[in-house]
């Protein structure tokens, strides 16, 4: 909190007559500090502490995957180079990100015995049906609910392939991006989010 107090000590409070203006200055200082502290950090997702100031969080203990690592790297670079944001109306930032690590994927595939189906020659529609009928790891559901309690805007769900990370092989972008619109019902959004993840 010392950076906040350092910022606030330069403000002449006697020139402000409005108590709401005082509150707004303090609030804005705290928000700026929280954003600055969260930038460039890959935080472990904790459902009881996740809030709108969280910038990049991971669920699980496995690898972040290629897209996750790339976004984390860019976020770190942006934090190291504040001059990137020296222009009015041109903020350089990554999208707020939550990554499901590879151990979540492995648990999903193993628990639902999906590897045999995924690697078979059956039609894609049948593979998709099997994935949509499968259950996500139970430990993930509470985290997704906590995430949806905070995020009140459309959500993009991206997937990675191990081959996307391979050198000299242009294999990126073979998986679709799924967009979930914001709707008031958390249950509806949770169903859409679960299906998109699968």
Indicate where each model-derived feature is located.
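Nucleotide/phosphate-binding sheet-loop regions of phosphoryl- and nucleotidyl-transfer enzymes
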Residues: 1-198
